[in-house]
Amino acid sequence: KLKEYDYIFYCDVDMRFVNYIGDEIFGDGLTATQHPMYAFKRPLWMPFDPNPESEAYIKQPGTLIESEGKPLFMPLYFAGGFQGGKTEKYLEAAKIISKMIDKDLSKNYIARWNDESHWNKYLMDNPPARVLTPSFVYPDSLIEEYYKPIWGCNYPPKIVTLTKKFTTRILSAQEQATLRGMSDLTKL
């Protein structure tokens, strides 16, 4: 039934649409959204899966791609909360990512950020045709003093990510490093 549609998009359940969304989401292939926490960050600081045994593992990120005729340096770290694209391309991605996740599960492993990690791995090998700004996964807990220096501008919210209880506490640098799989900050 899904194959009858020109485009398919996925959106997390904890999102609120707050602004008009037009044809800027449509491209010739996949559409991915820059993760607001990692927009304009260096690859070292992006939470790619560090386990070489995982299907989501990304060893040496860094590739120049073209999206909508504009050069982009990959990696960008993409949010899993809003994604999609041309039906054929997106269903193919979903099928492959499902197999990647199943393979990891057969080894009793869950990628660092679950399906989002696999989405990022897939996009490293199959770059998106359309890259959306963090406006499409805009945190409701936005702290302008934090995001403005990262983004260099203010993206107007289109889809707002609702804060989950476990994300309301800001983690210390050591806690963040531990979550990224680095128990010792001196290794940075």
Annotate the PLM regions.
Residues G27-T63:
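Short beta-strand-to-loop element that shapes/binds the nucleotide-sugar donor at the catalytic cleft/hinge
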Residues E4, L30-A39, S54-E55, K99, ...:
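Short, surface-exposed linear patches
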Residues K1-R42:
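GT-A fold catalytic core of metal-dependent nucleotide-sugar glycosyltransferases
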Residues W151, T163-L188:
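Long, low-complexity C-terminal extensions of enzymes
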